[in-house]
From Swiss-Prot:
Belongs to the class-I aminoacyl-tRNA synthetase family. TyrS type 2 subfamily. GO terms for biological process: tyrosyl-tRNA aminoacylation. Keywords: Aminoacyl-tRNA synthetase, ATP-binding, Cytoplasm, Ligase, Nucleotide-binding, Protein biosynthesis, RNA-binding. It is an enzyme of class 6 (ligase). Catalyzes the attachment of tyrosine to tRNA(Tyr) in a two-step reaction: tyrosine is first activated by ATP to form Tyr-AMP and then transferred to the acceptor end of tRNA(Tyr). The gene is tyrS. GO terms for cellular component: cytosol. It is found in: Cytoplasm. This is Tyrosine--tRNA ligase. Pfam families: tRNA-synt_1b. It catalyses: tRNA(Tyr) + L-tyrosine + ATP = L-tyrosyl-tRNA(Tyr) + AMP + diphosphate + H(+). HAMAP family: Tyr_tRNA_synth_type2. One of its GO terms (molecular function) is RNA binding.
Length: 412
């Protein structure tokens, strides 16, 4: 295929990038690619320890999609082998290790969600156990000899743990080396990653050169802040917008993003043309409420379609802006297995209002749970559904369910 002009590719690829090392090499690789009609091999490694993707993950996925759209080879490497080690990047302590079966299962889930952003027909998926599992101990020694302990301790997270007297296991030193080995195996021309992966990506450049390969270009993308506006987006911090979440939740959570992050979200997680960004920035500063509503709608459309965006927008206006209860409430009827009295934590989970009992407990403690608009304060509350239903159970501002009494009355 005919590749677009280099300047055109660079304009798109620079968008949102925190750092390109080195940028002139990327332009040269693109130029050579165009002259020889040979696509670049662009690598993105994914950590399968947490398979639920959120908008923060899409920052780097969207960059890989841009390379795809230009005609380059996109290789998504699932770290099923390195996942058994656990990525120590940004960690203050050793991560728990997973089994190969767990990393494979998570990796498949990651791929299925990632192809909501990537073109599945143009995405090559590889598992690094293909080559790392076959290494002999002598190969591991040879790989480890490529890096010194002093060099490893230049990593901020390792150095901080070392200075604080926190343990660093030897297997953690092998993680960046194994990740770098992935680049050697597929002969990557470009590797993408978050800014927290800078050390690992640059290490791969050195390892490629030691193996008589052309060094990859490293493109670092920023870590997107979550809905709290301070910490990076993370499901564990309860500030994430999942790409598989219900449209209403996705819309509502986007509307809770601080005003000063509207433009950053537009730039990093939407496909609004680059030339329109200055106008978007001006609009976000002058009318943040309207700009955020447009952003929320666009994000929902990207993952769920226009009709879902219409419903999510209407749901938000009715429940949050007007403070009402939506007309089309989902309903839940307890089953005999729930028992005569149902624990509220279980009821919220079974009605798909929370993902876990711990989340439900936290929401009650925050005063975010009501029954027929009456706030609930007791995390251990049990409900006689046959006597008290029907009622509207609300969790947070956007999650509702109408609880119906069991069909067989009090015989639950």
């Amino acid at each position: 295929m005919a590749f677009p002009p280099v300047d055109e590719q660079m304009t798109v690829l620079r968008r949102g990038a925190e750092e390109i090392v080195p940028e002139d090499e990327l332009a040269e690789k693109l130029r050579t690619s165009r002259e020889t009609d040979t696509p670049l091999t662009v690598k993105l490694g994914c950590d399968p320890s947490r398979p639920d993707l959120h908008l923060g993950h899409t920052v780097v996925l969207r960059k890989l999609r841009q390379f795809q759209d230009f005609g380059h080879r996109a290789v998504l490497i699932v770290g099923d082998f390195t996942g058994m080690i656990g990525d120590p990047s940004g960690r203050s302590k050793t991560r728990p290790q997973l089994t190969l079966e767990e990393t494979r299962e998570h990796g498949q889930s990651y791929y299925e969600q990632a192809t909501r952003v990537l073109d599945p027909n143009k995405t090559e998926i590889r598992y690094n156990s293909e080559w790392l599992d076959e290494m002999r101990f002598s190969d591991v020694i040879e790989l480890a000899a490529q890096q010194t302990v002093a060099q490893m301790l230049k990593r901020d997270d390792f150095n901080e743990r070392y200075e604080a007297g926190q343990p660093i296991s030897l297997h953690e030193f092998l993680y960046p080396l194994a990740q770098a080995r992935d680049s050697v195996h597929i002969e990557a021309d470009v590797e993408l990653g978050g800014t927290d992966q800078r050390f690992n990506l640059l290490l791969a450049r050195r390892l490629q050169e030691a193996n008589d390969q052309a060094a990859q270009v490293c493109m670092m993308l920023p870590l997107l802040e979550g809905t709290d506006g301070s910490d990076k987006m993370s499901k564990s911090l309860d500030n994430a917008i999942g790409i598989a979440e219900a449209p209403e939740d996705m819309y509502g959570k986007t509307m809770s993003v601080p005003d000063d992050l509207i433009y950053r979200y537009v730039e990093l997680v939407t496909d609004i043309p680059t030339e329109q960004l200055p106008k978007v920035k001006q609009f976000a500063e002058s009318n943040p409420r309207a700009a955020k509503a447009q952003l929320a709608r666009r994000i929902v459309e990207m993952y769920h379609g226009e009709e879902a965006a219409d419903r999510a927008e209407e749901h938000f206006e009715q429940t949050v802006v007007e403070g009402g209860v939506p007309d089309d409430l989902p309903e839940y009827t307890p089953t005999p297995e729930d028992g005569a009295e149902v624990g509220l934590l279980n009821l919220m989970r079974h009605a798909d209002l929370t993902d876990s009992n711990s989340e439900g407990r936290r929401m009650i403690e925050q005063g975010a749970v009501t029954i027929d608009e009456e706030k609930v304060t007791d995390t251990g509350r049990y409900i006689d559904v046959a006597e008290e239903a029907p009622f509207v159970l609300q969790v947070g501002k956007r999650r509702f369910a109408r609880i119906r009494p069991p069909e067989n009355g009090t015989d639950v």
